[in-house]
Amino acid sequence: MCIRDRIAAGAESGCEICKELKTLDHYLVKRSQWIIGGDGASYDIGYGGLDHVIASGEDVNILVLDTEVYSNTGGQSSKSTPLGAIAQFAAQGKRIRKKDLGLMATTYGYVYVAQIAMGADQAQCLKAIREAEAYPGPSLIIAYAPCINHGLKAKGGMGKSQAEEAKAVECGYWHLWRYNPELAEEGKNPFSLDSKEPDWSKFHDFLLGEVRYLSVKKA
């Protein structure tokens, strides 16, 4: 029984203090707790901890800022770095594909999982965060986050990171989706693909707009 229910029960039983507290129970909101980290920690060196947390079934929210590289330490390749991208320790382009953290988390069946890109769809981003907060169990949101190590060629550089997110989704480089276990309990499909059908004709230009991929072509 939560504190609101206890106060309500006390008020109904005639407790004067509880009656007074009940007039203020709109201040008793659920505390929002989030663990925020990058892809290096979440996909790679701290994955064991992340997996332990989501497997626990506890009501905890995790937000992964996916830059697809170790941003804080100089741009080293991580398990989130995509196939072909140039980074430190992958000077000729990474030779193996990116780890699909979101898909792996959905296999538990009781973890809320979403993939977002605020610059591509703010409404979907907010919806995923609200659903994760409301879900009574572990939730994992993976957010695409352009990084200075990507080497954005667009005029304005990192000042255009939101536009870069939109391009990534439009061309099919990054997908927007949500997996809500509560829908499965209602007999519905728990998976929702929120991004539109990609315009694959723009995929090549998107890659050439970032030094991490353009350099592979020049090599």
Question: Which residues does each predicted region cover?
Answer:
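Short secondary-structure boundary/capping segments
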Residues: 49-53, 76-86, 154-164
